[in-house]
Amino acid sequence: MEFSARERLIALIGVLFLFDGAFLLDIPVVREVLGAVVLAVIPGMLILSIFRPGKITLLEYVLLAVGVSLAVLMIGGLLYNNLLLYLGILKPFSGRLLLDCYNVMILALAAVWYLTNKGTSFYLPDPSIKAADAVLLLPALVFLPLSAFAMHLINTTGNNTLLIGLFFAILVYIGALCICHARASPWIMPAALLIMSVTLILPLALRSNYIIGTDTHFEYFTFISTLNNGYWSIIGSAQLDSCLSISILPVFFQIFTGISPMMLFKVIFALIFAISPLIIYSIAKQYLNEIYAFLAAAFFMIQPQFMTATSNSRTVLALLFFMLTVMLLLKEEGMNPLRKKALIVLFIAAAIFSHYTTSFIFFGILVFAWVGTGILSLKYPVRPAPSVDILVIFLALMYVWYALVTVVPSQMFVGFVEKTAENLDQFLMPETRGQDVQRLFGAHLPDKGLPYIIQFVLSWASIGLIAIGTLAMILDRKKTVLPGKEKAEYLKKKFSGLFFVLVITVTGLLGLMIIVPYLSDGYDLARVLPICNTILSVMFVVGGIAIAETLRFVIRYPGERRKREYLTSLPAGQSQLMKMSLAVILLVLLPYFLSATGVLHTLSGDNRDVVFHADGPQYDMKYIHDTEARGAAWLKQRMEPDVRVFADGFGVSRLMSLGTIPHSSLASFVQYGWVSRESYIYLRYKNVVDGNLIDFDGKYRDLDEFAQIFRHKDKVYSNGGSSIWTE
């Protein structure tokens, strides 16, 4: 289908007109859908069309358009906020004013785009669907409504059978795609990935009507404060105020879509991050067959860190920009170098404005990549990447934003480095490592039961595949990386020198997280893994292929074990290699999927996961009841200013999101062991119903241990699931 520039301009203005009408009349569904499209897609599409970065695939175009849109909203929103405040407008983020200014920006971009693309046409692929494509895609289309209905059942009846069945259906679907992939059109794999991605990432977001997580309560407070104030500024925790991903960005989406703030904050980041497996697919497809790229993306998608993205809002946005940057850096052909560099700088700036720690790690990876490719360039025709000017800009932006403007993130980083250095003499003490590292090496494993032992084995099986893939790439580097005519049969093209160095770099980063004392205690290994898996997901698949190559060699050619090259030229051998590779990869991937999602634990009677259960530690700590929300709202309305509120650790976080009470007015009486005379005590559901307290350390304590703090307090509010005490 062909569309002229004029037709596209008319369509764009039509969409904008429809959205404005839906916004002003508050038309349900239309406002929500068009608001999301107008914000998350249109700015990036216009900028890319004006910018013309070069030859990119449709998938890359869509991914870059979303990334550019989000980056422009954050960076442009900050400039807009500061400019209007300077002009004396006290609430830049008010509905009609923001809509008018946004319309002007979009129309200006549209005018520039039309003038620069007046004589061009746009071609869409043939929309017809083959019968085989329909058969492969239709089952996946059922996943999304099933996911929503399954969570409705769990929230209302506690029945998790449908959700377990859904996860088994996804497992079968992945296997079916691997079997039938040769019959599918090229677009089926990314479409299936996106549907499964949203299906897996939504359950936690839909688990209750309120925020689920720990840090996410603090992040929500930053967002709701910006929304209520009508402007952005450093108002509370500078480390959170420095993250525009949880302040300015969700404010745009809330004002434009009209979705309730808490529901929007729970869902929007999950939906945005759902495109991340497609970035993995795009990266992997440069080097591997489509089905291998699909499995690399699937491996990234079934990680626990991916499925809990809704509780790590600022981290996942920074990670998304890191992934887009890596995708651009690894794309060596077809793009204009200067325009590619401009996009990289934009995504780097967006990552800096999203999350400080991820940005520090991001910068470190790029520095080591530059050093590594520089060393390779001394002997091989490899260009050092990224370029020095990108690193200088990255460092300068971090210094300005973290050291001069918001200050606290740089102070935290320096303190973290100093504390890590102070703990180097405790190298042999396991307790100086974080809980994630201790679990990785089986701490307390015999006491936990069979599902945890199986998860431990499967985790190490996946690590084993990654290690084998990395070693195979290094040992067979003449066929996998280094310039020359010889190429491994499973590769479409050889891995670039930059990719090779990135694999070594992120592997080294994981090694440091495990080896260096305090490093994983100060910053969880679980937060670093998604960054590393951006690259290592490809190595997971390569590891499966390497094992299959060895098995094929041993089984089929026992007499030619020293002549490996004999195997690589036969089409039948290549087909056999793919079948064996898929079998090896699925043998690890599918059981690991059941373990990572919590299905295995649930079937064995373990109530670990809040998504499946209405009891257990996660539920006690993170699930919010309606009674707790009503109690927090009552307290917010009636509490006197400058009077402190005490609660247990997870009660403190609830009061920030449910009552929008600043952290400076909150404290844990469990941590301090006392309360001030003029103060409030807030007891949540677990405290009132079960008589248990849970502080920031996750340990359970009896409420009776703190009976003395209620001696001079009276109960002034109770609803059966929360209570409030004061003088």
Language-model regions: role of each:
Residues 173-177, 370, 452-493:
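Hydrophobic, aromatic-rich transmembrane alpha-helices
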Residues 270-271, 286, 298-299, 315, ...:
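Extracytoplasmic
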Residues 2, 6-18, 141, 190-198, ...:
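Transmembrane alpha-helix segments characteristic
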